[in-house]
Amino acid sequence: MTTSRRKAREIVLQALYEQDLAGHNAEDVLKRLLTETPQTEENAEFIFRLTNAIVKHKDLLDENIRQFASAWPVEQLSYIDRNVLRLAIFEIIHENDVPIKVAINEAVELAKSFGGNSSARFINGVLSSVSKALADTAKQREE
């Protein structure tokens, strides 16, 4: 059974994917998707907030992807992998109420559901590197 937040992340991923692939406006895509798959008011707010923030910070998120997946140019990643990483990296860095392990697990599950055969392993590796770098940065701040 999928959790309501997992379903919300699936909708965010669908909107990001469609915007990335077809150039459609993410907010218009969300309105259509939420008509097709109604959500609670709380989830709808989460979906819009998360999607809009990811779209706004796409260039910074892509820089993070470049840093932690340096062997893979962002432009050459599959649309799914690229947008799962954008979503998860945003959550890891900016969503303080989402534990890092949860953000990584949710991203891996999205990759298993929507990505290719090696997507989940790739996503997990990149996000583990992001998590480790954040932990190292936090330790340096404490010292």
UniProtKB/Swiss-Prot annotation:
InterPro entries: NusB-like_sf, NusB_fam, NusB_RsmB_TIM44
Function: Involved in transcription antitermination. Required for transcription of ribosomal RNA (rRNA) genes. Binds specifically to the boxA antiterminator sequence of the ribosomal RNA (rrn) operons.
Pfam families linked: NusB
Name of the encoding gene: nusB
Entry protein name: Transcription antitermination protein NusB
UniProt KW keywords: RNA-binding, Transcription, Transcription antitermination, Transcription regulation
Family of the protein in this entry: Belongs to the NusB family.
A biological-process GO annotation: DNA-templated transcription termination
A GO CC term attached to the entry: cytosol
GO molecular function, one term: RNA binding
UniProt cross-references to SUPFAM superfamilies, sorted A to Z: NusB-like
Species annotation: Dehalococcoides mccartyi (strain ATCC BAA-2266 / KCTC 15142 / 195)
